[in-house]
């Protein structure tokens, strides 16, 4: 259970999802984009919500991404509905793909009786296939909003093994505020905010500009610190919608409870990021890398991501092999500032390298530790005060099997 004490307040994780936030309902349906599973869904807010988005840095961007960016720009950061489909990415589909994304936005706007510029459109699935709009039109018509979140959480999945949901509660101005999220992602995960989609709802009253800054920072510290296979998708997107119905005083960085709000938002994002990393295609375990002693937090994060993204480290994790040589190799090519003679490495509670000198280790004990569902790798560079984390998963035979047969 997530807990964290902040300045006189506390945020905590509770049972719930995005519909347990005031003002939000969702829907999910099957329209035939996938063989049997739900494949189209929507989030709806009773009021125009202050909204922000963070998008893939892949230069090839899917049509729905472009439409959603346009919506946010034209509405001055307001959204009231989000339409999502899985099974088709609508990426690299030319001018007709953009036409289809606009039509999806228009259909959702009509369905939920909101202006088109207050609708976001997101898609995930196979790249390069035209969107079968007859199926999509039927699916949008079949959407029925409710406070049940599971159909939506299922409708956004592709190769995921299960839904990913979280809900966090925090006190702001003596008002209970909730921040909740739902995400999908299992393969093609190396976001610089793969495919990775994240949707966060909150009933906090927060200024749009502050919400945008908070999401960007939280994304950089969480979603951008996960990797499964090194691929950055054309469709990566994280959206946050704030209904304001908690009725707190408007939040920005000058608000006395800002640290509480940001801590809760970051916790929500981190929980989703870990769920994505742990659910990497074929994965059997989550890998968390903690780096200290870097010259800056940014460099610490870079080192952590280099370690967790190393195929050799990932395969060693699968094989329960405490091969720290692969870890120090990743540190060396990470591009960070370091002294090769002052590095410490530990795998779980076991020190393997101190001041760049090998330590006599119990290989059997380390291997036993690495049987766990979550393993922690620590590195200290002794160059400064910078700290950072990253998350990933082991690399298994099943990853190849799943991706070799993705379209079959």
Curated annotation (Swiss-Prot):
<feature type="binding site">
    <location>
        <position position="158"/>
    </location>
    <ligand>
        <name>substrate</name>
    </ligand>
</feature>
<keyword id="KW-0068">Autocatalytic cleavage</keyword>
<dbReference type="GO" id="GO:0005737">
    <property type="term" value="C:cytoplasm"/>
</dbReference>
<feature type="site" description="Involved in the stabilization of negative charge on the oxyanion by the formation of the oxyanion hole">
    <location>
        <position position="124"/>
    </location>
</feature>
<dbReference type="InterPro" id="IPR042195">
    <property type="entry name" value="ArgJ_beta_C"/>
</dbReference>
<dbReference type="GO" id="GO:0006526">
    <property type="term" value="P:L-arginine biosynthetic process"/>
</dbReference>
<feature type="site" description="Cleavage; by autolysis">
    <location>
        <begin position="194"/>
        <end position="195"/>
    </location>
</feature>
<dbReference type="Pfam" id="PF01960">
    <property type="entry name" value="ArgJ"/>
</dbReference>
<keyword id="KW-0511">Multifunctional enzyme</keyword>
<feature type="site" description="Involved in the stabilization of negative charge on the oxyanion by the formation of the oxyanion hole">
    <location>
        <position position="125"/>
    </location>
</feature>
<feature type="binding site">
    <location>
        <position position="281"/>
    </location>
    <ligand>
        <name>substrate</name>
    </ligand>
</feature>
<comment type="subunit">
    <text>Heterotetramer of two alpha and two beta chains.</text>
</comment>
<comment type="pathway">
    <text>Amino-acid biosynthesis; L-arginine biosynthesis; L-ornithine and N-acetyl-L-glutamate from L-glutamate and N(2)-acetyl-L-ornithine (cyclic): step 1/1.</text>
</comment>
<dbReference type="InterPro" id="IPR016117">
    <property type="entry name" value="ArgJ-like_dom_sf"/>
</dbReference>
<keyword id="KW-0012">Acyltransferase</keyword>
<keyword id="KW-0028">Amino-acid biosynthesis</keyword>
<feature type="binding site">
    <location>
        <position position="195"/>
    </location>
    <ligand>
        <name>substrate</name>
    </ligand>
</feature>
<feature type="binding site">
    <location>
        <position position="408"/>
    </location>
    <ligand>
        <name>substrate</name>
    </ligand>
</feature>
<comment type="similarity">
    <text>Belongs to the ArgJ family.</text>
</comment>
<feature type="binding site">
    <location>
        <position position="403"/>
    </location>
    <ligand>
        <name>substrate</name>
    </ligand>
</feature>
<protein>
    <recommendedName>
        <fullName>Arginine biosynthesis bifunctional protein ArgJ</fullName>
        <ecNumber>2.3.1.35</ecNumber>
        <ecNumber>2.3.1.1</ecNumber>
    </recommendedName>
</protein>
<keyword id="KW-0808">Transferase</keyword>
<dbReference type="GO" id="GO:0006592">
    <property type="term" value="P:ornithine biosynthetic process"/>
</dbReference>
<dbReference type="GO" id="GO:0004042">
    <property type="term" value="F:L-glutamate N-acetyltransferase activity"/>
</dbReference>
<comment type="pathway">
    <text>Amino-acid biosynthesis; L-arginine biosynthesis; N(2)-acetyl-L-ornithine from L-glutamate: step 1/4.</text>
</comment>
<dbReference type="InterPro" id="IPR002813">
    <property type="entry name" value="Arg_biosynth_ArgJ"/>
</dbReference>
<comment type="function">
    <text>Catalyzes two activities which are involved in the cyclic version of arginine biosynthesis: the synthesis of N-acetylglutamate from glutamate and acetyl-CoA as the acetyl donor, and of ornithine by transacetylation between N(2)-acetylornithine and glutamate.</text>
</comment>
<feature type="active site" description="Nucleophile">
    <location>
        <position position="195"/>
    </location>
</feature>
<dbReference type="GO" id="GO:0004358">
    <property type="term" value="F:glutamate N-acetyltransferase activity"/>
</dbReference>
<keyword id="KW-0055">Arginine biosynthesis</keyword>
<keyword id="KW-0963">Cytoplasm</keyword>
<feature type="binding site">
    <location>
        <position position="184"/>
    </location>
    <ligand>
        <name>substrate</name>
    </ligand>
</feature>
